[in-house]
Amino acid sequence: GIPVCHNICPCLIDKKTPPWTQVLSACLTSFEGKSLELPDETNFEISKPVDEKMFLELCGHLYLVDDEDRTEWLDNLAADLEVILDLYSLMTWDDIRSCIQNGFSIGSHSYTHRNLLQVKESEVLEIEISFSRQRILDETGIAPSVFAFPNGLYNDRSLKVVEKSGYSIALLCDDKPANIDIINNSDGLLMLPRINICRTNWREEVLRSSGLHYHLKRITNPR
């Protein structure tokens, strides 16, 4: 079967650095404007309170921006808003080992949580995928079998590195259920879809998790 799995980015633990999504969340808590100018010079409308659906939509926009540009933009935004991050709330390797002792499996979510579609250098791709697996093995004694693509973004090149690195399951964000044919197919496990739960409307989430929402979208928008 597919294990209950907590997917981590080892670099964030090694460097005690919060993920950029946590920095963004802290910034939005302090932000009082009605729109944000993003690094690509587009404007994103903000309404308070910022719910999870809006937050994920904003993350989706920012994830398509070059990693260095996004980091610089967030650093400037956090400085302008005088945001102070609670670094004590970040997980440590001791916490990860405790998770394993309590029945969790640990998977990789890449080394630094960058957009793998933007990675051109083979060495960087190896670090994000293969070295990430090695770091988890070094710290826990268990080589992870699961790789969760950051934001579900992947291509043939990154998928081949995942398979070569020894992972047997790769998680996407296609927002559709995985049927039994996929689960029973070893190749299908390397492109396993998932459904993101936003906790905004429980009725909609029931439809999405059942697969009905996905099939209705395919009927109304076959492209």
List PLM regions with ranges:
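Short beta-alpha junction loops
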Residues: 8-13
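Short, basic/glycine-rich phosphate-binding loops at helix/coil junctions
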Residues: 73-76, 106-112
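N-terminal-biased segments
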Residues: 51-53, 110-116
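Extended, charge-rich helix/loop segments that form flexible
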Residues: 16-102
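C-terminal active-site subregion of NodB/CE4 polysaccharide deacetylases
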Residues: 1-4, 15-38, 44, 101, ...
